[in-house]
């Protein structure tokens, strides 16, 4: 069942005689109980989109529905205030009142929403839910960053909203804390079964927590789908490059078909067999290859049976990444990124790359 529906929304700001679009004709839907992530670089419009759903921004056109109720529609002069939208909000800054105890921070939110149950009992419930049952009498400055984050989460859940909106909630934590809190958040959201819209610029975070991801760029939808689909089948060079470690090359079609492509910029012809099948015409083809889909072997070897794309190159750089090593391989002036768990290759060494054609995608620039 669709629980949140965003239909062709626009949000712009006047700048002299021009309009600067923060969100441009954006549409998507969120299923009930899903964790739906809006992913994109800084300035792409993801936070403005979240604030528009929350009622903190007034859209210029389009329509937003929550649980089949229209909450924003400028054409009908509908714009419900945030407290009328049955949403929970969690910000990048935890926005805890410093002069209030943890308990009072949560009861303040309950009072503001006219919570029908017993406030004291609800505070106990949500603090137990986030694993902090003993801190109700402490003040925010007596808590670690991770604890403050969990208190903010408890507060957002306290009045049992229909939809939870989370704007970069883990960005103020260090890497270890972020990974720990992702696990905790997933456990809690699995318990409460709450429809969640989550904003982040962190691809790893988005892939780990999401049922569905919307990638945004320049205020527009770039692509939407399950994490695996976005990773394996990007529809544009932007999505391929933004998600994961991808090689992206401008190309031309060989023999008029994208089944084989010539990479531009190489000093000698460099042609690859691709996974292209008949589909929409591509006017500006870009070849994309995931760095982990390329295999490396010692020395030049152009005669490897059963592999369509066998390429000889030279290791230009080596970058250690803990559980993997990233190599930059120069092939006639074109640079390939190859990620592998084999650390023995050295800069200056000649190597052979095997690139399965099923891993060579062709997308529109």
Named regions from a protein language model:
Residues 86-92, 96-241:
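ABC ATPase nucleotide-binding domains
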Residues 54:
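Helix-to-loop junction immediately C-terminal to a conserved catalytic motif
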Residues 246, 256-365:
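Non-catalytic connector elements of ABC transporters
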Residues 36-37, 89:
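Short beta-strand immediately N-terminal to the Walker A/P-loop
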Residues 62-74:
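Conserved ABC transporter NBD signature motif
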Residues 39-41:
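The feature captures the beta-strand-to-loop junction immediately N-terminal to the Walker
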Residues 11, 27-30, 343:
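Conserved A-loop
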